[in-house]
């Protein structure tokens, strides 16, 4: 997609995207955050470019070693939701035209294995 070669996987370059982002166990496993990126560039205050919509810092919402997680990301009925092990952590109404159907998994300084990974149209699951 546009400018992906320029971004080159550098985290700071993600500021230029218009997206929602969950950082689960970020900041050396000190925070779990939900952010909305507004597609701005450098020199703009981070709180304006990528405001934190909700944040957890308690141990129950940080990564645990040797634990298999069930993650569900859903976009339906005008909202996007993120649930971990059956607990809905984040939910946000999404305006028409917001979001373009892309999602990504970004992994950094961790050891991750995926099992039973699925992407599905919710209408086909009903």
Identify the function of each model-found stretch.
Residues 1-126:
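Extracellular glycan-recognition regions
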């Amino acid at each position: 997609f546009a400018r992906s070669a320029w971004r080159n996987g550098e985290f700071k370059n993600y500021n230029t995207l218009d997206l929602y982002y969950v950082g689960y166990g970020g900041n050396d496993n000190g925070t779990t955050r939900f952010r909305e990126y507004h597609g701005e560039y450098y020199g703009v205050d981070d709180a304006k470019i990528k405001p934190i919509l909700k944040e957890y810092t308690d141990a129950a919402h940080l990564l645990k070693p040797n634990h298999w997680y069930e993650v569900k990301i859903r976009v339906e009925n005008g909202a996007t939701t993120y649930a971990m092990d059956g607990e809905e952590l984040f939910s946000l109404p999404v305006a028409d035209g917001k979001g373009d159907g892309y999602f990504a998994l970004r992994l950094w300084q961790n050891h991750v294995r995926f099992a039973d990974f699925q992407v599905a149209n919710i209408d086909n699951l009903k």
